[in-house]
Amino acid sequence: MQSREPSGWRTAERRRGWRCRGVPTPSGDRGPGAARPAARGGAGETTGQQRPLQVPGASAAAARTRLLRWHHRVPSPRATRSPGSIRRTSPCSGGPDRPERPECADACCYLLDPFTLPLIQDFFRGCAASDFDRRD
């Protein structure tokens, strides 16, 4: 059976006197996170404006170099030290005990599965530019 008393976070917030942002309370102060009126300043001044947040190293030049470095994969120092963690550079690391496996299974570098490439080529061959050149 459901009680008539409202339950949940709304009741708790009502008890605490929570209000929407900027809605004045009976005492006159505004709710949480409301914009505070400017302390000083005439009508012509631009009061209340905030300076943009300045983050160290956030220049346009730094952003460009970061974009260039984003896709570059740097091996960890631990991987370069231990000989057991060095991966083979051959495209397939197959053997009698191992089934053939493409290189992308280790560190995924490909966007397309090698098996889907012929399907995509057939699709584009089907609607080649020569089809549009025909004027039958």
Curated annotation (Swiss-Prot):
Q: Where is this region: Disordered?
A: 1-100
Domain of life the protein comes from: Eukaryota
> Which residues fall in a compositionally biased region of kind Basic residues?
66-75
Q: What is this protein called?
A: Putative uncharacterized protein encoded by MIR1915-HG
Q: Which organism is it from?
A: Homo sapiens
Lineage at the top is: Eukaryota, Metazoa, Chordata, Craniata, Vertebrata
Name the gene behind this protein. Answer: MIR1915HG
